[in-house]
């Protein structure tokens, strides 16, 4: 695996990750995102439907929490999770937790980390964790770590230090077992940067992890309360400054467009794409614009036709009918609202996705009101394609030195 930087502007990194995969013949552009999956499948979509989406990321994200209970089957199968789920040509990154449904805290010890599957808690020792990775055979995998000290709340120095010490101990043990494993010789371990909101421990974690032979870095614990955004961003800038430039930086729990841009400005390369799934589960469609070539005022009013109406929404409004506790954002419209009952426009005018070319807001509203499964399929197709297009626009903006304009455009669409 080789990371080639084409351009670095004010901390933003434009480039390619080359020689990926078991054969070393795959390339991924950065900044970019991973394909969010649940038990190895894109939510609501079949493999055939997924192929109809433009710009699908080259790396799919698996979550250990959803697969740990089934690793015996995969171990017996012996061909890895890619072949098992019918995606043998895809690249896979295995993370510990599902960013949409993180488990309860308080189950990390010096010898194990717990993940939460469909049947409850699964305790992971280092040996069990590496045995599961041998069964999955991912291209990349997040190392076992103590991620319970985050920036979302004040962390004591003692707890932050314990988090870093445990994570480094887990990393050394995993690296040793990887050396002894024939199956995992071509897999890459992603080291995890921990330390909560304690600057000293964050920097120690970054420096010590960088000394190990890891293939990249995962910035953990930077998701959380928007009220502490400035603290998180300051920590993030300091941490990325300690990391080598020739290895990719991933971040977990950050997926909203405005937060993505803030992290890119601080040197982050790869993000999770769970935000489109959350939007779909709310019965909503992404409608924010990211085309800097268009007149922003005209784009907001004409392309989507909803900006003036959406300004009046209460940002704290919950969409309880969907069973999703996430708050609605200004980047989406709620198609369950009655006003879309006779709206025969596409979700986004000019969008090239299958849903927008073939269906209307009124039709999606009808599907949602009648609880048709097709609603989730069509919304997921649109939301994924829209989100992947956003990352394409980020790379174009970096090429053309227009990232500041793109950021301004995104910020103008927020409440």
Curated annotation (Swiss-Prot):
Compartments in which it is found: Cytoplasm; Mitochondrion outer membrane
One Pfam match: TGT
Residues holding Zn(2+): 351, 353, 356, 382
Cofactor note: Binds 1 zinc ion per subunit.
SUPFAM superfamilies: tRNA-guanine transglycosylase (SSF51713)
InterPro entries for this protein: QTRTD1 (IPR028592), Queuine_tRNA-ribosyltrfase (IPR050852), TGT-like_sf (IPR036511), tRNA_ribo_trans-like (IPR002616)
Protein name: Queuine tRNA-ribosyltransferase accessory subunit 2
Quaternary state and interactors: Heterodimer of a catalytic subunit QTRT1 and an accessory subunit QTRT2.
GO cellular component: cytoplasm; cytoplasmic side of mitochondrial outer membrane; mitochondrion; protein-containing complex; tRNA-guanine transglycosylase complex
Bilayer topology term: Peripheral membrane protein
Keywords: Cytoplasm, Membrane, Metal-binding, Mitochondrion, Mitochondrion outer membrane, tRNA processing, Zinc
Cofactors demanded by this protein: Zn(2+)
UniProt similarity note: Belongs to the queuine tRNA-ribosyltransferase family. QTRT2 subfamily.
Cross-referenced PANTHER family: QUEUINE TRNA-RIBOSYLTRANSFERASE ACCESSORY SUBUNIT 2
Organism expressing this protein natively: Mus musculus (Mouse)
Tissue: Expressed in brain, heart, kidney, liver, lung, skeletal muscle, spleen and testis.
Function: Non-catalytic subunit of the queuine tRNA-ribosyltransferase (TGT) that catalyzes the base-exchange of a guanine (G) residue with queuine (Q) at position 34 (anticodon wobble position) in tRNAs with GU(N) anticodons (tRNA-Asp, -Asn, -His and -Tyr), resulting in the hypermodified nucleoside queuosine (7-(((4,5-cis-dihydroxy-2-cyclopenten-1-yl)amino)methyl)-7-deazaguanosine).
GO molecular function, one term: tRNA-guanosine(34) queuine transglycosylase activity
GO biological process terms held by the UniProt record: tRNA-guanine transglycosylation
